[in-house]
Regions:
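N-acyltransferase acceptor-side catalytic subdomain
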Residues: 1-161
Length: 161
């Protein structure tokens, strides 16, 4: 699914309307004492959207903020990223593969990757999550959310924060 996963300079991040995935945001976080890294990756459009036929390679990147949580462990935080939003059925497997691919780019003491996704909720399209006035009732229980997001993954390691 993913190829060309490699580090790059944060000032080389692609332009995006998502502020938290920009070189500027990296500078803001660095001025506050955070360590940041940028990572390039590519994916076939068919692996993201299920469209058969034309093979198109999509290039993307993401900004990762590293946080030391104590003297022994750190966490990786991806604010409002990745920007690519696969079709619902490919989201879990995409993030799983991205996470595994990022392992070699992260410190050895990094114990987790937290994604604050800017993707549309799975449940935003389901009518039973809206009341008679069309107002969204909210997401289902955490266990249902985790089950749905882990669907199609190999390791079932995603947890709802």
């Amino acid at each position: 699914m993913l190829s060309n996963v490699r580090p790059k300079e944060t000032d080389e991040l692609y332009a995006t309307p998502i502020l938290q995935q920009t070189a500027f945001w990296s500078e803001v976080k660095a001025s506050l004492g955070a360590n940041t890294i940028a990572v390039n990756f590519a994916a076939e459009s068919a692996d993201l959207y299920g469209a058969a036929g034309e093979k198109q390679l999509i290039h993307s990147d993401l900004l990762i903020i590293l946080r030391q949580i104590d003297r022994n462990y750190s966490v990786a935080y991806v604010p409002h990223g990745p920007e690519l939003e696969p079709a619902d059925e490919f989201q879990g497997i995409f993030l799983e593969e991205l996470s595994e691919s990022l392992r070699s780019q992260l410190p050895n003491n990094c114990i987790l990757i937290r994604y604050d996704l800017c993707w549309e909720s799975y449940w935003a399209k389901e009518s039973d999550h809206f009341d008679e006035n069309g107002l969204w009732r909210g997401e289902p229980e955490q266990s249902a959310q985790e089950f749905r997001f882990n669907y199609n993954t190999h390791e079932w390691n995603f947890r709802k924060a």
